[in-house]
Amino acid sequence: MFKGTTIIAVRKGAKVSVAGDGQITFGENTILKHGAKKIRRLYNGEVIVGFAGSVADALTLSQKFEEKLEQYGGNLKRAAVELAQEWRKDKILRKLEALLIAVDKKDTLLISGTGEVIEPDEDVIGIGSGGNYAMAAALALRYNTDLDTEDIAKKALEIASKICVYTNNNITVETL
């Protein structure tokens, strides 16, 4: 079983950044890859997704989400709700172990493994093994510094990588 990842989304003003670490872990004690890319731009670069969980499952869900974005003209919320409904109804999709964070210029959404779509109260959301560490760090930085979203996301992941053994500091950041 592949596990471990940290993904963080940070929104501030008109900017939103999504960052992820690069580590893929197999079992409890084997690092298979240090430089994996877990952040993707979709729908002509207007949407950014970050995924955590089983690698194959996360890629499958990311692909399904991209199809829904195309089907619904880039409407992030509609695509997320439609994906969640399909996720809950489909016997194969229900077994997938993954989480997605999806952002566009207006919205930040968490699409959960139970087929739920959650719009966070805060301008920061984290998922994966180091998600809570990164989220706490990002919230502190977001409200107490003048750093921009890219710097907050990167610094939050650096902090999480010092705490979570399933998170490394090989960080990818995408910004809208």
From Swiss-Prot:
Catalytic site: T5
GO biological process: proteolysis involved in protein catabolic process
EC number(s) per entry: 3.4.25.2
Enzyme class name: hydrolase
Keyword Metal-binding: yes
Catalysed conversion reaction: ATP-dependent cleavage of peptide bonds with broad specificity
A single cellular component GO annotation: HslUV protease complex
A Gene Ontology molecular function term of the record: threonine-type endopeptidase activity
Gene3D superfamilies: Glutamine Phosphoribosylpyrophosphate, subunit 1, domain 1 (3.60.20.10)
Keyword Protease included in the entry's annotation: yes
Principal location listed in the UniProt entry: cytoplasm
Activation/inhibition comment: Allosterically activated by HslU binding.
Entry keywords, A to Z: Allosteric enzyme, Cytoplasm, Hydrolase, Metal-binding, Protease, Sodium, Threonine protease
Subcellular compartments: Cytoplasm
Annotated Na(+) binding sites: S161, C164, T167
Coiled-coil portions: none
Family membership noted in the UniProt record: Belongs to the peptidase T1B family. HslV subfamily.
Role description: Protease subunit of a proteasome-like degradation complex believed to be a general protein degrading machinery.
Known partners and oligomeric status: A double ring-shaped homohexamer of HslV is capped on each side by a ring-shaped HslU homohexamer. The assembly of the HslU/HslV complex is dependent on binding of ATP.
Name of the protein described by the UniProt record: ATP-dependent protease subunit HslV
Species this chain originates from: Thermoanaerobacter sp. (strain X514)
Phylogenetic placement of the source organism: Bacteria, Bacillati, Bacillota, Clostridia, Thermoanaerobacterales
